[in-house]
């Protein structure tokens, strides 16, 4: 009613009156124009009748009649419309003003609504009173039953309490039993891990000892090969010198035999021309010469036989030495290949040291200073990795629990968001429906259609809606709902980002855990020389230091000299040069000694030969 009254108040009656007057004036003007057009049409018809003959007029008469009838119909229609419009305007002007009635009707409507509400409340109170009376009568009749039910309820509550206590005790017992079982399992696993660690330490010690034995055998093999090579070379040089001496002796003896043969020929020649007195002396000399020649030939044969035997022996010895040298060279090449295949020991050692320093900090320094600073024994690499693995597993479990909590919260928020979205959509639909209803109500406000004034009120201004209407309230409520939905969406997006970050952290921890497990498996794999090298170089420095204290003085000196020689390429080169020079000096000294002995023997034989020649030439003896 308020809207209808406001619509009637917003009607501009003066503008409507002015428009009606203007429309009446326009009707008179249009009527005058139609009379002028009618007279002109009559004139044109007369002119057409005068210009044309009878036959042509007969042809055009139906058209003219149809046109005339249409014109008369339009004229009658226009006259009827104008008369109806004038009557409607008169009736509108003669209508009374309904504003006071509308205001009174609004008050009457409010009073009627209040009266209706009061009547409804009165009826509702009557019904409630009747219902309460009935219930009161029922309750009075059921007092005994209520008491029985109360007693039964108390009994059931006591039984329920007893049942709950028993169930709680059973659950506590089960939980305690499961906890004890879990503790026993954990203790067993801990003992098993300790046994495995002890086994691994024993394996590491055995691998270290094997590595040292292999290195010591390699050094011994190198020394034996070098010594055998030197001895074989020396023996070969001595044999060659002896062979050369034997050749010189053979040549000397052949020359001596040739000289004796010449002397014998000379003696035979002198025998023919000599005196008879010298026959006895020459016979004795010839006998002596024959004996000497026989002795020399025997010596030559004996020397040749011994030379052949010694040459065969030396050939066999040389072939055996060559075979042994080949086998030693093969072993040496195999050991060199093994060393070349494991030449990344220093790199792995440095990388693992850096890894320990980066991953574990001060706990990775295995020396006396770090022990004094930390106040405890430094743990080995596998134990540190196992501890870190356990720590990462605990962090992974906590992150998994947090992730489950985030997932639960996320699901709850998503469910709440869906509910809020449904509410928002329902509110949007209600708001749209209310807006459509309000728009239709506003459009329907005005003069009813039965009065026939809709076309006249087309240009009227739209009725204004009061600020006290429901539209601002609904729009503000919709805005609040939109803001709440946006805030919830932002919170959900934030939770999703947190969940993604937690999942990424879990993946990173899992990858790091897998990498650490692979490193532990690599370090715990049996039969690997690199493990022995790594653990010997990194994990057991303190134990090696204690073991080195028990080594004797000459072993320490030998080990230190070996380390000093094999430490750098320069030291190895210097040591090799020193051995080569020393070997050359020894060979030169031996060669000089053998040469001096051969020269002395040659001088003795030459002196003996000259003395014998002198005795023959001068003293005939």
From Swiss-Prot:
Membrane topology: Single-pass type IV membrane protein
Sequence ranges on the Lumenal membrane side: 596-621
Major localization listed first in the record, in broad terms: Golgi
Annotated localization: Golgi apparatus membrane
InterPro entries, sorted: CASP_C
GO cellular component terms given for this protein: Golgi membrane; nucleus
Top-level division of the source organism's lineage: Eukaryota
BP GO annotations: intra-Golgi vesicle-mediated transport; regulation of transcription by RNA polymerase II
Cytoplasmic side: 1-574
Protein keywords: Coiled coil, Golgi apparatus, Membrane, Transmembrane, Transmembrane helix, Transport
Transmembrane segment boundaries: 575-595
Pfam hit, one: CASP_C
Sections of the chain in a coiled coil: 101-445, 473-525
Any one GO molecular function term: RNA polymerase II transcription regulatory region sequence-specific DNA binding
Chain's role: May be involved in intra-Golgi retrograde transport.
Protein family per UniProt: Belongs to the CASP family.
PANTHER family noted in UniProt: CCAAT DISPLACEMENT PROTEIN-RELATED, HOMEOBOX PROTEIN CUT
Protein name from the UniProt record: Protein CASP
């Amino acid at each position: 009613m308020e809207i209808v009254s406001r619509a009637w108040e917003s009607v501009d009656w003066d503008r409507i009156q002015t428009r009606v007057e203007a429309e009446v004036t326009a009707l008179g003007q249009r009527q005058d124009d139609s009379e002028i057009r009618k007279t002109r049409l009559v004139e044109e018809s007369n002119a057409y009748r005068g210009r044309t003959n009878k036959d042509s007029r007969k042809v055009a008469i139906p058209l003219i009649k149809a046109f005339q009838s249409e014109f008369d119909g339009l004229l009658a229609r226009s006259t009827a419309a104008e008369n109806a419009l004038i009557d409607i305007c008169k009736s509108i002007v003669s209508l009374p003003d309904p504003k006071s009635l509308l205001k009174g009707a609004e008050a009457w409507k409010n009073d009627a609504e209040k009266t209706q509400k009061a009547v409804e409340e009165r009826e509702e109170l009557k019904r409630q009173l009747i219902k309460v009376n009935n219930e009161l009568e029922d309750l009075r009749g059921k007092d005994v039953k209520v008491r029985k039910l109360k007693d039964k309820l108390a009994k059931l509550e006591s039984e329920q309490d007893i049942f709950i206590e028993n169930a709680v005790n059973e659950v506590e017992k089960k939980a305690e039993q499961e906890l004890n079982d879990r503790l026993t399992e954990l203790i067993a696993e801990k003992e098993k891990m300790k046994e495995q660690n002890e086994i691994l330490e024993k394996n590491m010690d055995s691998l270290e000892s094997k590595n040292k034995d292999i290195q010591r055998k390699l050094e011994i093999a190198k020394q034996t090969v070098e010594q055998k090579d030197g001895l074989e070379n020396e023996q070969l040089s001595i044999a060659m010198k002896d062979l050369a001496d034997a050749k010189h002796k053979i040549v000397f003896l052949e020359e001596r035999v040739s000289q004796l043969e010449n002397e014998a020929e000379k003696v035979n020649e002198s025998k023919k021309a000599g005196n008879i007195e010298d026959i006895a002396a020459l016979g004795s000399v010839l006998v002596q010469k024959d004996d000497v020649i026989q002795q020399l030939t025997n010596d030559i044969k004996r020397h040749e036989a011994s030379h052949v035997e010694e040459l065969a022996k030396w050939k066999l010895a040389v072939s055996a030495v060559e075979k042994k040298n080949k086998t030693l060279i093969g072993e040496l090449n195999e050991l060199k290949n093994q060393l070349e295949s494991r030449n990344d020991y220093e790199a792995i050692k440095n990388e693992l040291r850096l890894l320990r320093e980066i991953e574990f900090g001060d706990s990775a320094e295995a020396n006396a200073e770090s022990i004094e600073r930390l106040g405890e024994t430094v743990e080995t690499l596998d134990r540190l990795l196992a501890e870190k693995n356990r720590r990462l597993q605990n962090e992974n479990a906590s992150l998994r629990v947090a992730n489950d909590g985030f997932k639960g919260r996320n699901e709850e928020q998503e469910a709440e968001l869906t509910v809020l979205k449904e509410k928002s959509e329902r509110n949007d639909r209600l708001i749209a429906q209310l807006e459509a209803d309000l728009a239709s109500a506003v459009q329907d406000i005005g003069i009813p259609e039965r009065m026939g004034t809709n076309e006249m009120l087309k240009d009227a201004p739209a009725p204004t809606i009061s600020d006290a209407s429901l539209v601002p309230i609904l729009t503000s409520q919709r805005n609040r709902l939109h803001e709440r939905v946006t805030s919830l969406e932002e919170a959900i997006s934030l939770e999703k980002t947190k969940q993604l970050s937690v999942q990424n952290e879990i993946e990173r921890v899992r990858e790091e855990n897998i990498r650490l497990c692979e490193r532990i498996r690599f370090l715990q794999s049996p039969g690997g020389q690199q493990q022995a090298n790594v653990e010997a170089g990194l994990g057991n420095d303190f134990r090696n230091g204690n073991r080195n204290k028990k080594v004797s003085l000459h072993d320490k000196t030998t080990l230190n000299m070996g380390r000093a020689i094999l430490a750098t390429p320069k030291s190895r080169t210097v040591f090799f040069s020193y051995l080569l020079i020393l070997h050359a000096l020894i060979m030169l000294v031996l060669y000089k000694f053998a040469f001096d002995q051969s020269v002395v023997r040659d001088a003795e034989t030459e002196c003996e030969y000259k003395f014998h020649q002198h005795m023959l030439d001068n003293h005939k003896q």
